[in-house]
């Protein structure tokens, strides 16, 4: 329990009393319609300009504050591309700091997706031509600047990439962007009295008490009755989310960060590490309001108690309230997914590695990040088995490659179907085994990175570098 001053105690007691006296319907009415990031649909070879520059937003109503963003708004527009296409991309840095960018989940060489060594100085630009050769998935792009990524992401340099292919477009899935195919970028924040973001760079980790989705707090979204698809990106610096629905119905997992499953898998909850993405379906045919939450469902007593808490819990754990409307949908049968290539999962292991992570000591295999050191070299096309343990619960991620989760704590996963990932949550002192596939090259000048997905710890050195050669 925190130590409160008399004034703080009186203020919070008054707020708690108001919470108990206010009808629940009043709280719901105070939620605002969800903001949907604008979308850039990329045709074949169409130029796309992403202007990193200062912007303004209101985290607290009526308090306009300075932030960073892309193309003039807080956060970034969604970029939607097609598989087997290419993108002429231009980043323009109109910020006062050097920035490097990464498209996490996009499988391509570092000269296309970016590297921590591909610096974009202030008032400069970079124009890679990116070839897209992978199945449909949800990626995200974000600042990946050495020693400064957490601050820059927190300020607003983050957005979603969507890759589509012909099979996913033909599948029986909700696909109307912003209508029944909803992008959700999750962030936890801390604000001062003026509504300005607060971040202490000296903290080991960052846990804000307030939850924002697409840059907005306490949002709802009206949808037609039937199935709705949620594309969820954890853009928080340190916080994992335990996704579930408040009415205990399942979330139907259809995709992880680098591809779709063979069929929807109903799950009671899904743990989402920083930088991790999932796609889920929610059934809303009954017409009742359903909330996507993190953690357990809370009642008014819990919310009042949380006002006096000094832990890392969110003040409001409702991510998004879904409000179905209209008649029951004709599209009421469970959606189907695109054809599944089982041969992609027949893997031959070329090598094994063991990674022991001590994130709070900023160490991986007793080594702290050194930008001049390459930790290992992988042959392009190889598959490796990685045994990973961490002495603290933390996310793990890598760039430019993908993996299957083979075991957790030496137990085979109960999932019905395999799925490709680039990020995974590690429980404390539990071994996770990954089968990692390396299909794209990275040079010693522009290496790929691996390490914790907690951006605060990553900036402090809990990461490494590898190259992929022919």
UniProtKB/Swiss-Prot annotation:
It is found in: Periplasm. Gene3D superfamilies: Cupredoxins - blue copper proteins (2.60.40.420). CDD domains: CuRO_1_CueO_FtsP, CuRO_2_CueO_FtsP. GO terms for biological process: FtsZ-dependent cytokinesis. It comes from the Bacteria. Keywords: Cell cycle, Cell division, Periplasm, Signal. InterPro entries: Cu-oxidase-like_N (IPR011707), Cu-oxidase_C (IPR011706), Cu-oxidase_fam (IPR045087), Cupredoxin (IPR008972), FtsP (IPR026589), TAT_signal (IPR006311). Predicted to be exported by the Tat system. The position of the signal peptide cleavage has not been experimentally proven. GO terms for cellular component: cell division site; outer membrane-bounded periplasmic space. GO terms for molecular function: copper ion binding; oxidoreductase activity. Residues 1-28 form the signal peptide. Belongs to the FtsP family. This is Cell division protein FtsP. Cell division protein that is required for growth during stress conditions. May be involved in protecting or stabilizing the divisomal assembly under conditions of stress.
């Amino acid at each position: 329990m925190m130590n409160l001053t008399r004034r703080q105690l009186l203020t919070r007691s008054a707020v708690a009393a108001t919470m108990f006296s206010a009808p629940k319907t009043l709280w719901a009415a105070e939620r605002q319609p969800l903001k949907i990031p604008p979308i850039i649909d990329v045709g074949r070879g169409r130029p796309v300009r992403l202007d990193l520059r200062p912007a303004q937003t209101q985290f607290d109503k009526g308090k306009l504050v300075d932030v960073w963003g892309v193309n003039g708004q807080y956060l970034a527009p969604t970029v939607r591309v097609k598989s087997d296409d290419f993108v002429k991309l231009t980043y323009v840095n109109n910020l006062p700091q050097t920035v490097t960018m990464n498209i996490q989940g996009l499988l391509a060489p570092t000269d296309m997706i970016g590297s921590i060594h591909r610096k974009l100085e202030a008032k400069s630009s970079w124009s890679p031509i990116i070839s897209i050769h992978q199945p449909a998935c949800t990626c995200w792009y974000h600042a990946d600047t050495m020693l400064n990524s957490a601050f820059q992401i927190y300020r607003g340099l983050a957005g979603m990439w969507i890759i589509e292919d012909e099979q996913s477009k033909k599948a029986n899935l909700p696909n109307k962007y912003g209508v029944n195919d909803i992008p959700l970028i999750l962030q936890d924040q801390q604000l001062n009295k003026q509504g300005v973001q607060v971040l202490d760079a000296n903290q080991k980790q960052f846990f804000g008490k307030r939850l924002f989705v697409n840059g907005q707090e306490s949002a709802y979204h009206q949808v037609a009755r039937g199935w709705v698809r949620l594309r969820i990106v954890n853009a928080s610096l340190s916080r994992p989310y335990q996704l579930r629905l408040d009415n205990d119905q399942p979330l139907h997992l259809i995709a992880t960060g680098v591809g779709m499953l063979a069929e929807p898998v109903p799950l009671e909850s899904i743990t989402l590490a920083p930088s991790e993405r999932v796609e889920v379906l929610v059934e809303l045919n009954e017409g009742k309001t359903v909330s996507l939450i993190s953690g357990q469902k809370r009642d008014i007593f819990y919310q009042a108690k949380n006002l006096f808490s000094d832990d890392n819990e969110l003040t409001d754990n409702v991510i998004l309230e879904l409000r179905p409307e209209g008649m029951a949908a004709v599209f009421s049968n469970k959606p189907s997914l695109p054809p599944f290539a089982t041969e992609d999962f027949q893997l031959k292991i070329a090598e094994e590695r063991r990674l022991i992570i001590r994130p709070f000591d900023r160490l991986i295999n007793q080594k702290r990040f050194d930008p001049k050191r390459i930790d290992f070299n992988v042959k392009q096309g190889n598959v490796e088995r990685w045994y990973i343990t961490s002495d603290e619960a933390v996310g793990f991620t890598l760039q430019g490659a993908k993996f299957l989760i083979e075991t957790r704590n030496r137990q085979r996963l109960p999932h019905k179907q395999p799925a490709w990932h680039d990020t995974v949550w590690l429980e404390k002192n539990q071994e996770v085994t990954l089968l990692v596939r390396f299909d794209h090259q990275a040079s010693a000048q522009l290496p790929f990175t691996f390490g914790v997905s907690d951006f605060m710890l990553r900036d402090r050195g809990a990461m490494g570098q590898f190259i992929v050669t022919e």
